[in-house]
Amino acid sequence: METTARTIDRRMFLASGLGVAAATGLARSADAAEPSPMEKANMQIVKDFCAAWPSHDLEKILAFFPDNGAYRMTETMEPAKGREALTARIKTIINNVSQFEILDTWARGPMVVNERIDRFSNFQLKSWHGVGVFFVKDGKIVEWYDYTIASERA
């Protein structure tokens, strides 16, 4: 049996664990502290980012990332890192997105987690239900990782 070595850095490990935690419902409890002003700002950035997708405006969407931003479309894919790779990855679905419906959002410092249903038209999927983990720094999404809960084929 052939094995392959895979390097997992601390951030990827934490993002994976947080994605699983969010997917299983470990969000803010009813008696949790109110989000800080920074956390509220970070949640708003992610909300605005998700709201931008149905516009199909590539530059508007890319403006949420720094030049060295990263996006991993699913837990089984490698992240697209840097402006060129982000552009190429986003172009694969941008024109098919009809809605990102945010079901829940919470934040801890620079990390924002949302549960959402992404809806598509003229695409292999009708909808995708999952969890997004976003790391926000200086008003930009530096890393975005998505974790699948369920999907519905077209």
Where are these regions (language model features)?
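N-terminal secretory signal peptides
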Residues: 1-8, 22
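N-terminal export leaders
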Residues: 8-17
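Boundary at the C-terminal end of the N-terminal hydrophobic targeting segment
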Residues: 27-32
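Short acidic-aromatic low-complexity motifs
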Residues: 43-64
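A solvent-exposed, acidic/Ser-Thr-rich amphipathic alpha-helical stretch
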Residues: 59-108
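Short, surface-exposed coil-to-beta transition loops
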Residues: 98-101, 126-132
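A short hydrophobic beta-strand element
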Residues: 109-118
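Short beta-strand edge/turn micro-motifs at domain boundaries
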Residues: 129-154
